Amino acid sequence: MASRFDRPLRTASLRFVDLETTGLRPDRGARITEMAVVDEGGVRYDWTSSHDPPRDEAVAAQLPQLVAHLDDGIVVGHNLSFDVRFVTYEAERLGLDGIDVCFIDTLGLARRVLARAGSYRLGAVLAAVGAAPEEELHTAVGDALATRTLFWRLVERGGLGTLADAGAKRLRWHGR
């Protein structure tokens, strides 16, 4: 029986995601300030808080929209565990539903494909594969676009053909 991860990468609906935050730890008060989802057609979703720190009601209104843009695709992000930690923390704190998605982390993929890279920060691995960012890094849209470029360069370098080859996994978290 074929696994859902046997699907060719070129035919998968990929959603490249990034968040920007006020800090590193949501449990110590850091909050989401920007969220973006990009696909092969461009920016699907882009939100930036107009308040510092972001208001709970704004984040509560935006998280379901973010998840809706991820539900029908394979989520791809760089150091995705960081973003997932913030999304799950905020969703739990605000009483929102959980998520059930398949994902690929380009950080792990870069460590596999570029085994001798000196740094695995997004800008460094982008440069290591000979690519430049389309937009400014350290913005949600800029990093999501850079992740898309990085992903396809890693796929090419690694000779990867399927979701399984790229290390796709399933993430299930149920809120409320």
Describe each model-derived feature in a short phrase.
Residues 1-101, 115-116, 120, 124-138:
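Conserved non-catalytic scaffold segment of RNase H-like nuclease domains
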Residues 100-111:
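A short, structured active-site edge motif that brings together acidic residues
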Residues 1-9, 148-176:
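Acidic two-metal-ion nuclease catalytic site recognized across multiple nuclease folds
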Residues 136-153:
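A charged, well-structured terminal subsegment
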Residues 80-84, 107, 144:
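Alpha-helix N-cap/helix-start capping motif
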